[in-house]
């Protein structure tokens, strides 16, 4: 084989390998769909948090059940916890670490006013969405350990999304129990 042919084949092989590597790193279509859904839930949660009067943030439907404010802090804590559990760096400012659920529980016990809770909710969603967007398609099928289970990265992100919907529904019920109509209704 002539040197020029070898150089051409080497260049072609490099392009093919580079293309495959870039393709494996692209964001998963599932992650893109989940991000769109999370953005809709985020808007509703933040709009609802703003609509509920601050004096109702301590309201709870019965003893032993999270209050409005505790639900908002729980959502924020889990928005930090989930990406960290999937393997992304923990958010140092939050103190929540994926390998230590007690850090999420401690976060939920913080004392904050309404404005601070909403700001924390917004910051936690920015962290969550950044790491969802940074999840390459190749990582979605890889196993991760979450809450003692071995699941795929994709399932972990789906659980994260369904968790947000669960608490949106909870806060809608809390709001309506207190005479607050969700702003989008």
Whereabouts are the PLM-identified features?
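Short, contiguous alpha-helical
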Residues: 35-46, 56-102, 143-185
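Acidic/histidine-rich, surface-exposed loop or edge segments in extracytoplasmic proteins
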Residues: 25-28, 96-110
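Sec/Tat signal peptide C-region and signal peptidase I cleavage site
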Residues: 20-24
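Acidic/histidine-rich alpha-helical segments that form the ligand environment
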Residues: 105-143, 152-163
């Amino acid at each position: 084989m002539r040197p020029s042919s070898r150089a051409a084949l080497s260049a072609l092989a490099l392009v093919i390998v580079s293309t495959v590597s870039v393709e494996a790193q692209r964001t998963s279509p599932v992650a893109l769909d989940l991000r769109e859904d999370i953005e809709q839930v985020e808007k509703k949660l933040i709009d609802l948090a703003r609509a509920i009067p601050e004096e109702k943030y301590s309201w709870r439907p019965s003893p032993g059940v999270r209050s409005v404010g505790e639900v908002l802090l729980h959502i924020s804590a889990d928005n930090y916890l989930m990406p960290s559990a999937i393997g992304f760096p923990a958010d140092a400012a939050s103190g929540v670490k994926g390998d230590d659920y007690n850090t999420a529980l401690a976060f939920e016990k913080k004392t904050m006013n309404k404005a601070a809770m909403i700001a924390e909710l917004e910051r936690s969603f920015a962290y969550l969405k950044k790491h969802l967007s940074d999840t390459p398609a190749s990582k979605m099928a890889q196993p991760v350990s979450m809450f003692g289970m071995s699941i795929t990265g994709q399932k972990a992100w789906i659980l994260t999304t369904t968790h947000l919907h669960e608490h949106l529904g909870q806060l809608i019920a809390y709001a309506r129990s207190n005479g607050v109509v969700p702003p989008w209704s």
